[in-house]
Regions:
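Alpha-helical transmembrane signal-anchor/signal-peptide segments
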Residues: 1-7
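Short, solvent-exposed loop/turn elements at beta->coil junctions and helix N-caps
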Residues: 10-14
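Extracytosolic and intramembrane catalytic regions of membrane-associated proteins
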Residues: 15-159
């Protein structure tokens, strides 16, 4: 009903229920995300876009670690540059929280080039591009479970 032309759509029930659903649509250059409760009074609305920015990853695209991240995310990821840090956001598990499409995605990794003097080898002893990939945000970090559960229950009731 949003008249959005999309490449792919992914819907799934949120945890522990089949009343509150999440939806993610892939556009040519971005993703949109929404929640929908069976108790909502209006149809789901995709309002906030998250640009893919896949071009930010191009200098590292042939790196084995980067390819593993892309596979892990099923190809559903966005890139951001925050405070001069290149961040890979895995969209596979959705967003943290239920605040009208504005919450961050659950999994993210900072990608940085290591010191050029450091040489990394893969399992075949071939030289690799030296990259450091560090998980910086996950569903386990800085959680306020009681608050999140209350937000979940409120959103479940519908808007």
């Amino acid at each position: 009903d949003n008249n959005i032309e999309y490449k792919d759509i992914n819907t799934r029930a949120t945890y522990f229920n089949s009343i509150l659903w999440s939806g993610q649509i892939e556009l040519e250059d971005s993703y949109m995300f929404t929640y929908y409760s069976l108790f909502d009074k209006s149809p789901p609305s995709f309002t906030k876009k998250f640009p893919k920015n896949h071009d930010m990853l191009m200098p590292f695209i042939d790196n084995k670690k980067i390819q593993q991240l892309i596979i892990l995310s099923n190809g559903h990821y966005i890139m951001t540059n925050e405070n001069n840090e290149l961040i890979f956001w895995n969209l596979k598990l959705g967003q943290k929280g239920f605040d009208k499409n504005a919450s961050p995605y659950i999994w993210s990794y900072v990608i940085e080039k290591t010191d050029q003097s450091e040489i990394l080898l893969d399992e075949t002893n071939e030289k690799m591009n030296a990259l450091k990939i560090q998980e910086v945000r996950s569903f386990r970090n800085n959680r306020k479970y009681s608050e999140e559960f209350n937000n979940f229950m409120e959103r479940l009731k519908g808007i």
